[in-house]
């Protein structure tokens, strides 16, 4: 009887341990897998900028003055005349009607009808422009080559130069609230503001990487991405940055350039880059997991209008939709 009791206890203990390990393995495994699908853009342009106002209405811009627009979540894209053949690098819309595109040679265009027509905006620079950000309908910034920062306080009617203190190309700008924001660029350049963009202060990144993009999950937690896999994190609004660059791995010859980063909430973030790479975090950047990508062409633009759907675009007119789902 004693031997039978011991046997039952041993089996029960083994089952408990097995269930414990099974539960641990399930908890440790990623819970969510994205569905990534190709969309037909009808264009061969290299697409560098993308913005979705909502899950139906979006725009993409790129080489040869290309502007594409969708009103049905990317099922169909139509080409819109931009009035220029300049390379367009970024697009931003304040609402469903008012928007801007920027690009090479100081190109700035604005639309008041949802991107159907575009008019010229004259600025005081011929430098290439790469980034757009507005903190209110009246107050916004453009950033670009040679340390260019342009500011508007009248809704984009007029743009004035601001001192950046650098000659490095500035590629991306983000405002986390009406007082704080960050700019990133070449040669490890990171600038921050704490006075509503009246002035910009250089921060030490301890890197010579070219940063292509910056995004914040909230007012203090942000990420910058760049060439050769550069991945940097701040937890204090941009004053200090920590190198979180992912290891290359045994079969890796060169770290992939990371070109765009977006966070849809405090936990969930996305990165796209060279060779169609898509990375995702569901734990605030503690881990980044590579998602299966249907393309090998570089992805250079990324937009998430909602936590449940996003789009990326890149070389050869590539556009993909990204829809999170359960594993």
What are these regions (language model features)?
Residues 10-21:
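Bacterial N-terminal signal peptides
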Residues 23-327:
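Residue-level hotspots at or immediately adjacent to binding/recognition sites across diverse folds
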Residues 2-12:
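Bacterial N-terminal signal peptides that target proteins for export
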């Amino acid at each position: 009887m004693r031997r039978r009791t011991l046997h039952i206890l041993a089996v029960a203990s083994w089952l408990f341990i097995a269930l414990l390990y099974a539960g641990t393995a399930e908890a440790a495994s990623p819970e969510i897998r994205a569905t990534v699908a190709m969309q037909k853009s009808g264009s061969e342009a290299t697409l560098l900028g993308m913005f979705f106002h909502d899950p139906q209405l979006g725009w993409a811009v790129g080489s040869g003055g290309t502007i594409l627009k969708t009103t049905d979540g990317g099922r169909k894209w139509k080409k819109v005349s931009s009035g220029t053949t300049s390379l367009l690098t970024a697009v931003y819309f304040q609402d469903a009607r008012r928007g801007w595109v920027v690009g090479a040679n100081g190109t700035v265009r604005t639309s008041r009808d949802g991107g159907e027509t575009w008019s010229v905006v004259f600025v005081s620079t011929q430098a290439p422009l790469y980034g757009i950000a507005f903190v209110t309908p009246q107050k916004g910034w453009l950033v670009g080559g040679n340390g260019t920062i342009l500011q508007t306080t009248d809704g984009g009617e007029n743009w004035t130069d601001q001192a950046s203190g650098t000659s490095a190309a500035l590629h991306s700008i983000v405002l986390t609230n009406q007082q704080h924001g960050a700019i990133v660029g070449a040669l490890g350049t990171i600038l921050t503001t704490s006075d509503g963009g009246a002035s910009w202060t250089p921060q030490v990144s301890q890197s010579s990487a070219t940063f292509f993009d910056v995004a914040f999950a909230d007012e203090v937690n942000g990420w910058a991405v760049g060439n050769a896999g550069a991945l940097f994190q701040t937890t204090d609004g941009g004053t200090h940055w920590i190198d979180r660059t992912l290891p290359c791995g045994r079969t890796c010859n060169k770290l992939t350039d990371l070109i765009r980063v977006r966070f849809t909430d405090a936990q969930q973030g996305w990165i796209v880059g060279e060779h169609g790479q898509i990375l995702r975090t569901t734990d605030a950047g503690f881990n980044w997991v590579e998602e299966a990508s249907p393309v090998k062409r570089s992805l250079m633009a990324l937009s998430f209008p909602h936590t449940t759907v996003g789009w990326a675009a890149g070389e050869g007119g590539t556009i993909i939709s990204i829809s999170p789902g359960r594993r």
